[in-house]
Amino acid sequence: GSALTPERSQQILDSGLTRIRFSFDAFTPGTYSKVRVGSLPLDRVIRNVETFLELKEKGNYKLPVVGVSFCKVKQNEHEVEDFIKFWQPKVDLISIQKFMPPTTNKEKYKKYYASDQYNELPVTEFKCVQPFQRFVFRNEFMYPCCVSFNKDLKLGSIKNTNIYDAWHSPKMNEIREMHKNGKFYEMKTCKDCVNLIYPPSEKLKNSTQKEA
């Protein structure tokens, strides 16, 4: 939302875009300045998004579907409810997301985990929707999701692989089938991802280590 201007907002509305989401990750200016370091002041970003919504309403645009997102971490978790109450009457959807570290080093990013992100029970079944929804391109390579810690999810290079063929490839179908059956643990990246998003509590981690 910080890059929005009335002119850009109008261009987006006229472009035929079907979905757009604005990330805030905070409700108060103080918290916003801590989690969104270097951004414009929060009130200005909110005003930008509200202008976008006003233009959409005045122009009777049905699309795009407008959402706002909030990545919950220890530093902002106390503002989730206020964030939802503020935006609920204004937008089509609100996404409250769990923190995902940029690497598999959980200990390094432990200080960011929200208090309710830890699991008292091990995650035994998880079905990811991303392989059914999207492709992600990173450094010319195609992936079935936004997580690419390891090479096991790499589906080929855009330079020599047709997108249609990659989308319908045996590997892509295998990943989808795996998640349909809740067997995320059969693929290293998927297993690492679930363990990072749903980390075990210290109590669970200790009991698991004792059993081992």
Q: What positions do the PLM features span?
A:
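Radical SAM/AdoMet-radical enzyme domain recognition
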Residues: G1-Q97
